């Protein structure tokens, strides 16, 4: 977050045409969502092998094509090509970073999304620091590049290139933020997005997402929303099917796509296989809805101990889905593989697979991290020396055994930090070292022991991330990474970047 209602995108560590192209797309995406003007702060692009004239002619084309409102160029080369940027409404050029910082131009930036893009030698960290709104905050950093790497990791496991991919973005994309995740997945041509309820789907549509969207848990009151926003519901029993048909007929809708769920052993939702003949007759008796896919849900595809049962599920699904397919002349897609199934049961990939937790960096097979996507971090608010005989926190639960340095950080159970992690049961990282939680975790704040850590107020504390896997927290809590990710509250700011 920047000063004067600005949003900053800091990509000040490298600069080349390819990364500029990607970063400009990111800038456009953020400005469209927020309705703000687009500003680019760009340094000379070094060591490209192109002539200065050729290079900056291409840069000018990229900037113009993205509708950049304001360009701030820094460096001798880009300044010498100022005339090439006439297609940008506002243009300012400075010979070096010091001149930019002295100019006072930052005071004129209001309600803009600002992309800071520069080569390392220009020290644009100083620019970012000058523009950044200085607040104590807890943020969830989401690495979109890592997420795409995870997507491609699982795509590489597909036996056939024509196998389609459904990506799960329900529960705010497992806590990462549904719009940015959905937008990135759409750009990488996934075939379907899946959310839990119609409201999640309609919000994505309003934000400009055009990909096909499946509603996994449709409610009887949400049919109008699904019709209006072209959201395709899962249908799992006759009560829901009949109500949906009636609502579609009332609206004069025909051939509205649905996704038929079969119960092959989860015993949560779905038609039983012996109901399929009746289901076929019901579907053929009307033209309001049409089955787009038929699917089921593995119970334990992540564990070898359930392999016999998983194979039984596959066999039952093959039987039931084939019966449904043969009753219709159009192609009905089949899918049963989740993240673990993609890897462990490639023979069951059928026409489509569903990618969930693996997209967000966690392998459900062994809880290992593929490419870490989310990092939860916060800032030390205060450090105090506490005598060894004192206690820390509510109910005096933080018992000290020595004189200690205790730091307060602005994250609590209202942010999604589980209370069971307190009282020394877990730790965060401060400057790369373990800082145990002391006493009870409070609603908005918790305390950590930094006695043996060289740190000061304002330093960062990492709750989970690259060096402290989220699975460490979930293991401490005796739960799964899904729960930890989806527990991060909406008041925690999401910050997106591409590595």
Language model: regions and residue ranges:
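Active-site anion/phosphate-binding pocket segments in diverse small-molecule metabolic enzymes
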Residues: 141-143, 148, 152-156, 164-165, ...
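A general beta-strand register signal
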Residues: 2, 115, 429-430
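Residue-level signal for inorganic ion chemistry
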Residues: 11, 44, 71, 116, ...
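C-terminal helical cap/extension that packs against the catalytic core
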Residues: 12, 37-40, 46-112
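ATP-dependent carboxylate/acyl-activation modules
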Residues: 29, 113, 118-129, 134-136
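Active-site-proximal beta-alpha core segment in soluble small-molecule metabolic enzymes
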Residues: 139-143, 148-149, 162-335, 349
């Amino acid at each position: 977050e920047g000063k004067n209602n600005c949003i900053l995108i800091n990509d000040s560590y490298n600069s080349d045409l390819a990364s500029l192209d990607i970063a400009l797309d990111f800038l456009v995406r953020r400005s469209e969502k927020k309705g703000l003007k687009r500003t680019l702060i760009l340094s000379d692009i070094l060591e490209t092998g192109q002539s200065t004239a050729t290079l900056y002619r291409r840069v000018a084309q990229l900037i113009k094509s993205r509708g950049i409102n304001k360009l701030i160029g820094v460096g001798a080369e880009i300044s010498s090509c100022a005339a090439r940027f006439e297609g940008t409404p506002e243009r300012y050029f400075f010979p070096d970073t010091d001149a930019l910082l002295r100019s006072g131009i930052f005071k004129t930036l209001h309600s803009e999304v600002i992309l800071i893009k520069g080569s390392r030698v220009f020290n644009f960290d100083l620019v970012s620091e000058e523009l950044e709104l200085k607040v104590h905050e807890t943020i969830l950093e989401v690495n979109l590049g890592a997420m795409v790497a995870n997507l491609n990791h699982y795509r590489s496991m597909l036996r056939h290139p024509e196998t389609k991919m459904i990506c799960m973005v329900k529960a705010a994309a497992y806590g990462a933020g549904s719009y940015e995740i959905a937008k990135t997945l759409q750009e990488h041509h996934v075939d379907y997005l899946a959310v839990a309820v119609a409201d999640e789907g309609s919000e994505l549509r309003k934000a400009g997402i055009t990909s096909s969207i499946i509603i996994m848990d449709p409610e009887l009151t949400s049919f109008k929303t699904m019709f209006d926003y072209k959201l395709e519901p899962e249908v799992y029993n006759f009560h829901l099917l009949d109500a949906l048909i009636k609502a579609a007929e009332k609206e004069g809708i025909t051939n509205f796509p649905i996704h038929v769920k079969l119960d092959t052993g989860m015993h949560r939702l779905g038609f039983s296989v012996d109901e399929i003949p009746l289901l076929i007759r019901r579907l053929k008796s009307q033209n309001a809805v049409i089955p787009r896919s038929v699917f089921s849900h593995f119970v334990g595809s992540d564990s070898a101990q359930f392999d016999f049962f998983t194979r039984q599920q596959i066999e039952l699904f093959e039987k039931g889905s084939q019966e449904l397919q043969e009753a219709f002349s159009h192609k009905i897609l089949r899918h049963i593989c989740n993240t673990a199934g993609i890897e462990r049961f490639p023979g069951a990939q059928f026409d489509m697979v569903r990618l969930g937790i693996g997209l967000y960096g966690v392998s459900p097979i062994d809880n290992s991290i593929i490419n870490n996507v989310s990092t939860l971090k916060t800032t030390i608010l205060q450090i105090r020396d506490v005598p060894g005989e004192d206690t820390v926190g509510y109910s005096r639960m933080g018992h000290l055994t020595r004189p200690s340095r205790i730091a307060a950080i602005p994250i609590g159970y209202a942010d999604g930090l589980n209370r069971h992690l307190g009282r020394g049961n877990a730790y965060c990282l401060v400057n790369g070292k373990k800082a145990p939680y002391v006493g009870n975790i409070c609603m908005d704040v918790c305390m950590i022991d930094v006695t043996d850590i060289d740190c000061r107020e304002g330093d960062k504390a990492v709750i989970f991330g690259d060096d402290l896997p989220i699975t460490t927290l979930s293991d401490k809590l005796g739960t799964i990474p899904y729960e930890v990710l989806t527990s991060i509250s909406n008041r925690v700011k999401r910050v997106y970047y591409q590595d």
